[in-house]
């Protein structure tokens, strides 16, 4: 499953879940309506960096920006997330980052504040489980030798 198929799989899970539950919780629907984002991991990689979910910028919520490449990811505004991650592994242009490293958020839903993200998803363990199942399938496809958690939120899962 490549990044396009992964995005389709996530969308199918969400659409089936919405259809089945007919839920009307504004917070989780708002999260879903922001659009999904996945990293392009087209090759198997030795090292996989996991985050919990993509950030969200209300001013720049571009729903057409659905894919990114880890080695080219750039920070927006005051965030230094990507700069720190690249530096941890030898810099954006290092052989490790360019050729041997992938990135995958456990959830494709955009939200910058981890506590808010967890609070919104807490009542919807079924949705969380379905999304994580697709993420697990992608991790198995990438077949990393080592998984590094970008933060304690991703370590929890």
Regions found by a protein language model. Give the residues of each.
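A sequence-composition feature that detects small, non-aromatic residues
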Residues: 9, 73, 83, 148-150
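Short, well-ordered loop/turn elements at secondary-structure boundaries
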Residues: 43-45, 97-98, 141-144
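Active-site and ligand/interface coordination hotspots across diverse enzymes
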Residues: 1-77, 131-138
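Glycine/proline-rich loop-helix segments at beta-alpha junctions forming the active-site rim
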Residues: 111-157
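Mobile, glycine- and charge-enriched loop segments
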Residues: 46-53, 57-127
């Amino acid at each position: 499953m490549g990044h396009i198929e992964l995005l389709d799989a996530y969308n199918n899970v969400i659409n089936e879940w919405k259809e089945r539950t007919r839920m009307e919780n504004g917070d989780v629907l708002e999260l879903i309506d922001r659009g999904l984002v996945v990293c392009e991991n087209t090759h198997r990689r030795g090292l996989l960096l996991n985050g919990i979910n993509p950030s969200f910028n209300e001013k720049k919520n571009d729903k057409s920006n659905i894919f990114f490449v880890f080695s080219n990811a750039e920070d927006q505004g005051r965030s230094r997330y990507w700069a720190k991650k690249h530096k941890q592994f030898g810099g954006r242009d290092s052989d490790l980052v360019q050729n041997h490293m992938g990135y995958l958020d456990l959830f494709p839903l955009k939200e910058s504040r981890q506590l808010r993200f967890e609070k919104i998803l807490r009542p919807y363990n079924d949705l969380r489980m379905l999304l994580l199942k697709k993420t697990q399938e992608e991790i198995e496809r990438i077949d990393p030798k080592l998984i590094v958690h970008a933060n304690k939120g991703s370590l929890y899962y």
